[in-house]
A protein has these predicted regions:
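Short loop segments at secondary-structure junctions
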Residues: 26, 82-88, 153-155
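Glycine-rich beta-strand-centered segment in the early N-terminal region that forms part
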Residues: 35-51, 64-114, 160-163
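Short N-terminal strand-loop motif that marks the start
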Residues: 1-78, 147-149
Length: 178
């Protein structure tokens, strides 16, 4: 199919629904079940393997300073590619990707999918959002506090298969320090 394999790299079937820990009100998560979204030609479906908890997650949980509720939090996550669109061949650094690879993601450029994270050093780029801090929409799998996340075309993501789970979870917090 144009949208890639219907089973995970581990050989198991991809479920028809996904579960999301949705922040539905201040200090209140609900486990919501949503239909598994379609994977477009430029998208990647990732089975979440782990996610750190950031101070930003705690602020959103306590006060919703960004006015995002309802929201699927979690932006320090990592997981395994279980389905990918036919146009996905390389990550944001140009490294090849395939089913079973471990990835992290940071930004989605909804206004201009041709922008890459490397353009951030060259120009003031607007329209960038962060997974785990996206307003809820019809996809719902927008944060790493879920069992699956849909990385949409136009997102930055990196193949980090050479790292163990703990190291992969620490990539985003360490990147903030650089």
């Amino acid at each position: 199919s144009a949208a890639g394999s219907a089973s995970s790299a581990a050989g198991g079937p991809i479920p028809k629904t996904a579960h999301v820990a949705m922040l539905t009100s201040l200090e209140h998560f609900e486990i919501k079940e949503f239909p598994m979204p379609e994977v477009g030609d430029d998208d990647i479906l990732v089975k979440v393997e782990g996610c750190g908890i950031c101070g930003t997650d705690a602020h959103e949980f306590k006060r919703d300073p960004f006015g995002l509720i309802p929201v699927a939090l979690g932006h320090e996550g990592t997981g395994e590619i279980v389905k990918m669109g036919k146009n996905v061949k390389v990550d944001s650094a140009g490294n090849s990707v395939k089913l079973g690879d471990k990835v992290v993601t940071c930004m989605i450029f909804k206004d201009n999918p041709d922008i890459t994270m490397f353009d951030l050093n060259k120009q003031n780029v607007g329209g960038a959002d962060v997974y785990g801090l996206l307003p809820d929409d019809d996809v719902h799998l927008n944060g790493w506090f879920a069992d699956y996340i849909l990385i949409r075309g136009g997102s930055t993501f990196f193949n980090v298969s050479d790292l163990d789970l703990d190291s992969r979870i620490l990539i985003e917090p360490c990147a903030v320090l650089v």
